[in-house]
Amino acid sequence: MNILDIAIILVLIMSAIIGFKRGAIKEIVSLVGIIVVLILAFAFKGVLGNVLCKWLPFFNFTGSLEGVKVLNILFYQVIAFLIIYSLLFSVYMIIVKISGVVQKIVHMTIILWLPSKVIGAIVAFITGYVMIFVVLLALLIPLKNTDVFINSKFANYIVFETPILASSSENISTSINEIYSLGEDLSKGNISTNEANVETMDVLLKYKIISPKTARQLIVLDKLDGISGLDKVIEKYE
């Protein structure tokens, strides 16, 4: 167990304690709201991500993926997800505050007080778990090959094996895994930087992180200048 595992446990415990204090109604509204926010964020991240890719600068990554420009596409998709999630989360917080009024009425009823507290703790634990999943997924690009993530007993399970959540983000997490494998080949000299860029594009198209149309638009905008062989990869998915 490392520091990341300890942080995860503390967040889950604190979530349950807060849920016990807040009660069932507020926590159920909270959990449903987060799930809806997640679904909408995943649904619309592609549209915003494509806009960000086209009009914001591409970065030069360091480390094993140095020179892999195409990785910027995945980076901006994650940023787009976080932007949409944050905006929707703000709306959801307003709804949670409104639900607090209903919760106060429930607490005035002695018979419902304790069950509400217990259910609130359970639901809040689940909500905390979902929030941890979102944070780990957002940090997957910088954390993936770090010792703290690799040696964590809980982080890998949460991101890659959690029922429903893992399958909903499978395209992103799987593409990151495959791209990091390409990074290892690149650092060992098994493939060139150009080949790493081309194969990364293939991964992003295969998992529908980007559409062939957007990929061609990025080429026209000179965002992927200096990379040869992209046309053949894009043609495979048109």
Spans of features found by a protein language model:
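Alpha-helical transmembrane segments and their juxtamembrane interface "caps"
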Residues: 1-238
